């Protein structure tokens, strides 16, 4: 039986700590050494649409960036040397938003590592809807120890 996705949502949750309502990866389409393509299905049921914006629901740009960062975290934390660690955003540069994302859109999230030295790296990222680029940016990321969980 052929596997439909490179990683399901359940498998994603084994790698990154994000959970509802701040979990933005539905599945991973492709993953290689330095690049990932993941999918976020934007639905009207997202909490954010209660206030952003009534009558004109628009997925916030900052959450598109967070979605891209989560895809990047999966890519980074799947590397053997970083399993069990945390990936953090160190910076976001050259963010551009080309069109709005609305309920019903399917975002394809691409994150490609361009440089990695020690625990710090950079990446180019882009989000697409219907094959059109909606957002681009460059990330600086830092990998560090995971914080202790307290309940």
From Swiss-Prot:
Involved in unsaturated fatty acids biosynthesis. Catalyzes the dehydration of short chain beta-hydroxyacyl-ACPs and long chain saturated and unsaturated beta-hydroxyacyl-ACPs. Belongs to the thioester dehydratase family. FabZ subfamily. One of its GO terms (biological process) is fatty acid biosynthetic process. This is 3-hydroxyacyl-[acyl-carrier-protein] dehydratase FabZ. It catalyses: a (3R)-hydroxyacyl-[ACP] = a (2E)-enoyl-[ACP] + H2O. The lineage of its organism: Bacteria, Bacillati, Bacillota, Bacilli, Lactobacillales. GO terms for cellular component: cytoplasm; membrane. GO terms for molecular function: (3R)-hydroxyacyl-[acyl-carrier-protein] dehydratase activity. Transmembrane segments: none annotated. Disulfide bonds: none annotated. It is an enzyme of class 4 (lyase). Its main location: cytoplasm. The gene is fabZ1. It comes from Lactococcus lactis subsp. lactis (strain IL1403). Keywords: Cytoplasm, Lipid A biosynthesis, Lipid biosynthesis, Lipid metabolism, Lyase. It is found in: Cytoplasm. The active site is at 52.
